[in-house]
From Swiss-Prot:
One of its GO terms (molecular function) is lipid binding. The lineage of its organism: Eukaryota, Metazoa, Chordata, Craniata, Vertebrata. Pfam families: ApoL (PF05461). The keyword Cytoplasm applies. It comes from the Eukaryota. Keywords: Cytoplasm, Lipid transport, Transport. It comes from Homo sapiens (Human). This is Apolipoprotein L6. It is found in: Cytoplasm. Residues 1-10 have a biased composition (Basic and acidic residues).
């Protein structure tokens, strides 16, 4: 029984193979007539489109990561600059506070504070300018991946203006710092070289009780420094320095929090959102492509079955005609033989 079942199974498989291998009729063509021209074009072009979309998605995500990485570096640089500004603010406050007690110490602290403030400002300006330049390069790369609009000329002009403005600010700050430092250095050496002037300066800053002549000498010798400032001017300067110090501390705290959260930029998040949108679009197109492929295969199987049935019918009639002609020839031959025999 088992052998018989195996033979029947093999016979069935052989029959099915013969049906699959049977040639189709030459006068019948397989056509995907149910597909529109747009669907046919889509089936042909989708493999290339799929690779392009995958490449763009990968490029957008890599660009977003690169933007965040660059922003994190500049955030750290800004934190260093802000920390320097905080130290500068503290030194400036100490310079104002110590002016009545020690003129030389006040001058040194004020000079150092001004120098640190300038260094912090220059670092911040350079960092901001470079980051804007990097962001514009990233925007250009993003537009190469997903073209939107051309703003190259305008961006070039803006970039040149940014560099000119940054250079102007740096030169202005450096010039003022050097000028302030020279005044303080000259005042320091005058203070060391003239003890009487130093005593008059100390009395003026502590009690304010000095002669008019001494007051004029102090104002002339130390003009533009903390030693020539009145009490009200020192208080006002201290308030402004304290306000600036508080602002720098708040900025430092904000930058630290931003860095701890990953220091991600809005532009990078937009690129990631665009990549996710393209990924969803690719999934939808892939499903459509598979659906159309299934439709074509189903159509091909149905047409194949029809073609197989048509070919079997034609083969049957061809064989029947051959048998009829063969019997007709036999009958004719038999009739001729009988006729010859009896004549």
């Amino acid at each position: 029984m088992d052998n018989q079942a195996e033979r029947e199974s093999e016979a069935g498989v052989g029959l099915q193979r013969d049906e699959d291998d049977a040639p189709l009729c030459e006068d019948v063509e397989l056509q995907d007539g149910d597909l529109s021209p747009e669907e046919k074009i889509f089936l042909r072009e989708f493999p290339r489109l799929k690779e392009d979309l995958k490449g763009n998605i990968d490029k957008l995500r890599a660009l977003a990561d690169d933007i965040d990485k660059t922003h994190k570096k500049f955030t750290k640089a800004n934190m260093v600059a802000t920390s320097t500004a905080v130290i500068s603010g503290v030194m400036s406050l100490l310079g104002l506070a110590l002016a009545p007690a020690t003129g030389g110490g006040s001058l040194l602290l004020s000079t150092a504070g001004q120098g640190l403030a300038t260094a912090a400002g220059v670092t911040s300006i350079v960092s901001g300018t470079l980051e804007r330049s990097k962001n514009k390069e990233a925007q250009a790369r993003a537009e190469d991946i997903l073209p939107t609009y051309d703003q190259e000329d305008r961006e070039d002009e803006e970039e040149k203006a940014d560099y000119v403005t940054a250079a102007g600010k740096i030169i202005y700050n450096l010039r003022n710092t050097l000028k302030y430092a020279k005044k303080n250095v000259r005042a320091f050496w005058k203070l060391r070289a003239n003890p009487r002037l130093a005593n008059a300066t100390k009395r003026l800053l502590t009690t304010g009780q000095v002669s008019s002549r001494s007051r004029v000498q102090v104002q002339k010798a130390f003009a533009g420094t903390t030693l020539a400032m009145t009490k009200n001017a020192r208080v006002l300067g201290g308030v402004m320095s304290a306000f600036s110090l508080g602002y720098d501390l708040a900025t430092l705290s904000k930058e630290w929090k931003h860095l701890k959260e990953g220091a991600r930029t809005k532009f990078a998040e937009e690129l990631r959102a665009k990549a996710l949108e393209l990924e969803r679009k690719l999934t939808e197109l892939t499903q459509l492509y598979k659906s159309l492929q299934q439709k074509v295969r189903s159509r091909a199987r149905g047409v194949g079955k029809d073609l197989t049935g048509t070919c079997e019918t034609e083969a049957y009639w061809k064989e029947l005609r051959e048998h009829v002609w063969m019997w007709l020839w036999l009958c004719v031959c038999l009739c001729v033989c009988v006729y010859v025999q009896f004549t």
